[in-house]
């Protein structure tokens, strides 16, 4: 009796030149940058001219790899990174991603005033009531 096994390729995000990263610590926290050069196992050289991130060596523990990539030659200068970034429409792709929308929603919720939080609570109650009413009717 033979069984066919299915081998699937891993779906990991690789540390590669041209990979877009989200910085989670430091002065540029919350901004996007691109990996320009891999220094060693734990450090990469990043550059984010459109987001205002200066070219710098950063520890991989301080960034999160995003699923976005674009073609970029190794060790590219800031002007090249800027042109390739714009050509690949990285900012638009990031803004359309659910990850960016979730971050924006989290920031919006954190900025709510007490009265706005109250309004959200009332609207959620109204929504819950209409859903219960529709389910009871069906």
UniProtKB/Swiss-Prot annotation:
Subunit structure as annotated in this protein's UniProt entry: Component of the large ribosomal subunit (LSU). Mature yeast ribosomes consist of a small (40S) and a large (60S) subunit. The 40S small subunit contains 1 molecule of ribosomal RNA (18S rRNA) and 33 different proteins (encoded by 57 genes). The large 60S subunit contains 3 rRNA molecules (25S, 5.8S and 5S rRNA) and 46 different proteins (encoded by 81 genes).
Phylogenetic lineage: Eukaryota, Fungi, Dikarya, Ascomycota, Saccharomycotina
GO BP annotation list: cytoplasmic translation; macroautophagy; maturation of LSU-rRNA; ribosomal large subunit assembly; ribosomal large subunit biogenesis
Principal location listed in the UniProt entry: cytoplasm
SUPFAM superfamilies the UniProt entry points to: Translation proteins SH3-like domain
GO cellular component: cytosol; cytosolic large ribosomal subunit; nucleolus
Pfam (any one): Ribosomal_L14e
Keyword terms, alphabetized: Acetylation, Cytoplasm, Ribonucleoprotein, Ribosomal protein
PTM annotation, UniProt: N-terminally acetylated by acetyltransferase NatA.
Function: Component of the ribosome, a large ribonucleoprotein complex responsible for the synthesis of proteins in the cell. The small ribosomal subunit (SSU) binds messenger RNAs (mRNAs) and translates the encoded message by selecting cognate aminoacyl-transfer RNA (tRNA) molecules. The large subunit (LSU) contains the ribosomal catalytic site termed the peptidyl transferase center (PTC), which catalyzes the formation of peptide bonds, thereby polymerizing the amino acids delivered by tRNAs into a polypeptide chain.
Organism: Saccharomyces cerevisiae (strain ATCC 204508 / S288c)
Full protein name: Large ribosomal subunit protein eL14A
PANTHER family found in the cross-reference section: 60S RIBOSOMAL PROTEIN L14, LARGE RIBOSOMAL SUBUNIT PROTEIN EL14
Entry's localization field: Cytoplasm
Gene label: RPL14A
InterPro entries for the chain: KOW, Rib_uL2_dom2, Ribosomal_eL14, Ribosomal_eL14_dom, Translation_prot_SH3-like_sf
Protein family per UniProt: Belongs to the eukaryotic ribosomal protein eL14 family.
Molecular function per GO: RNA binding; structural constituent of ribosome
N-acetylserine modifications at: 2
Disulphide linkage map: none
């Amino acid at each position: 009796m033979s069984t066919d096994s299915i081998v699937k390729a891993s779906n990991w995000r690789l540390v590669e030149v041209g990979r877009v990263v989200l910085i989670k610590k430091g002065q540029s926290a919350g901004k996007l940058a691109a990996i320009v050069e891999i220094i060693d196992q734990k450090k990469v050289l990043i550059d984010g001219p459109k987001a205002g991130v200066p070219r710098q060596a950063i520890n991989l523990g301080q960034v999160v790899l995003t699923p976005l990539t674009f073609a970029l030659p190794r060790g590219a200068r800031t002007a090249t990174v800027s042109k390739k970034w714009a050509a690949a429409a990285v900012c638009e792709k990031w803004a359309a991603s659910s990850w960016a929308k979730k971050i924006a929603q989290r920031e919006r919720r954190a900025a709510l005033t007490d009265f706005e939080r109250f309004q959200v609570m009332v609207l959620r109650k109204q929504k819950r009531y209409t859903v219960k009413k529709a389910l009871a009717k069906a």
